[in-house]
UniProtKB/Swiss-Prot annotation:
This is Heat shock protein 83. GO terms for cellular component: cytoplasm. Keywords: ATP-binding, Chaperone, Cytoplasm, Nucleotide-binding, Stress response. The lineage of its organism: Eukaryota, Discoba, Euglenozoa, Kinetoplastea, Metakinetoplastina. Pfam families: HSP90.
């Protein structure tokens, strides 16, 4: 009999483990979550936070979301190929990154979503129009906010989270119209009262003075610069806390939000900021306005189109003057940001860079002397020089860019000469002698050459 070789195949199940997201969260260990996170994200570190949840009702899906410990260096690159949310339908893998499951501002969150309701043959084009996907997306955002709340319970953990993903929270306030109030609770800022720690808006409101109606803030490059800004002088004198907003994205955030817990935001670098005053203070300010009317008019005539108007300030304490922008125009910091844009719209910039208002401190010695000089002689040349010098220094202290650096340097040099009691005519004569001396040597040299 002929022997027949019989081949049998035995199949071994490779994925013996039940998918992690289908298990009860109580039965999953921290180590299992960490291993799963590293497998789907290619990260070498454990996640900072984990959210394992399921949604049941009109639709059903399970999900695990992770927050990494560090933000990727190219997180805000527009053309970056992302690998964030993996989509499964009834445990069948559909795609590596489903962009429609998460808004852009949550681009740092990693995880998986397994839906029971989406069709297995769904295409990328159909996903964008799918109503089920929109409901899943809404639930994911909600659960992510809950996860951030859990992180915020530990002060040190949230400090690390905010250092890495604070910009994303602010981007969410700008883009997410459904959750701005909730996202504002996650914001942290330095302030005049917070010291080395950052403060929440909620804590700021609890520390507000009796009768204080606004949340005062100022935008700029750094905390160090803002601490010495002339804009916060009067607020500090009155014991009012001021928030320091030092990131460019803060400017865009404040365009979106107007209040927090019924307290309106007030930018100290713009017009329309008023502090609570007693009747005595109001009367004194009115008297100062009347006394400075002629001086303000003269300064406006000297400066011309450089400023819209010159007024008496109620926000200065020790500085002679500052420049403020209109309530709805760009601040000095925003103007600087837009100047640095490589492809900015020049026509839009010209429209938004509204004319500045110069505010004077009537109690400052320089302004008092200027007032006396104006009253003595409106055509005094020194007055004109002093006005331009005050305007240029106000540009610098208020965060603007100097319009004429050369002219500013010349005026400073003239003031230095006055301080050193140098005579400009004598100096000019000396310069002429120095210039003519080499000319004689040149003539002599050429004559010798002719003799040779």
């Amino acid at each position: 009999t002929k022997k027949v070789k019989e081949v049998t195949k035995e199949y071994e199940v490779q994925n013996k483990h039940k998918p992690l997201w289908t298990r009860d969260p109580k039965d999953v260990t921290k180590e299992e979550y960490a291993a799963f996170y590293k497998a789907i994200s290619n990260d070498w570190e454990d996640p900072m936070a984990t959210k394992h949840f399921s949604v049941e009702g009109q639709l059903e899906f399970r999900s695990i979301m992770f927050v990494p410990k560090r933000a990727p260096f190219d997180m805000f690159e527009p053309n970056k190929k992302r690998n964030n949310i993996k989509l499964y339908v009834r445990r069948v893998f559909i795609m590596d990154n489903c962009e429609d499951l998460c808004p852009d501002w949550l681009g740092f969150v990693k995880g998986v979503v397994d839906s029971e309701d989406l069709p297995l043959n769904i295409s990328r084009e159909n996903l964008q129009q799918n109503k089920i996907l929109k409901v899943i997306r809404k639930n994911i955002v909600k659960k992510c906010l809950e996860m951030f709340d859990e992180v915020a319970e530990n002060k040190e953990d949230y400090k690390q989270f905010y250092e890495q993903f604070g910009k994303n929270i602010k981007l969410g306030i700008h883009e997410d119209t459904a959750n701005p109030k909730k996202l504002m609770e996650f914001l942290r800022f330095y302030s005049t009262e917070s010291g080395l720690e950052m403060t929440t808006l909620k804590d700021y409101v609890t520390r507000m003075k009796e009768g204080q109606k606004s949340i005062y803030y100022i935008t700029g490059d750094s905390k160090k610069k803002l601490e010495s800004s002339p804009f916060i002088e009067q607020a500090r004198r009155r014991g009012l806390e001021v928030l320091f907003m030092t990131e460019p994205i803060d400017e865009y955030v404040m365009q979106q939000v107007k209040d927090f817990e019924d307290k309106k935001f007030a930018c100290l670098t713009k017009e329309g900021v008023h502090f609570e005053e007693s009747e005595e203070e109001k009367q004194q300010r009115e008297e100062e306005k009347a006394a400075c009317e002629k001086r303000c008019k003269t300064m406006k005539e000297v400066l011309g189109d450089k400023v819209e108007k010159v007024t008496v300030s109620d926000r200065l304490s020790t500085s002679p003057c500052i420049l403020v922008t209109s309530e709805f125009g760009w601040s000095a910091h925003m103007e600087q940001i837009m100047r640095n844009q490589a492809v900015r719209d020049s026509s839009m910039s010209a429209y938004m860079m509204s004319k500045k208002t110069m505010e004077l401190n009537p109690r400052h010695p320089i302004i008092k002397v200027l007032r006396r000089r104006v009253e003595a002689d409106e055509n005094d040349k020194a007055v004109k020089d002093l006005v331009f010098l005050l305007f240029d220094t106000s540009l610098l202290t208020s965060g603007f860019q100097l319009e004429d650096p050369t002219g500013y340097a010349k005026r400073i040099n003239r003031m230095i000469k006055l301080g050193l009691s140098l005579d400009e005519e004598e100096e000019a004569a000396e310069a002429t002698v120095v210039e003519t001396a080499p000319a004689e040597v040149t003539v002599g040299t050429s004559s010798m050459e002719q003799v040779d």
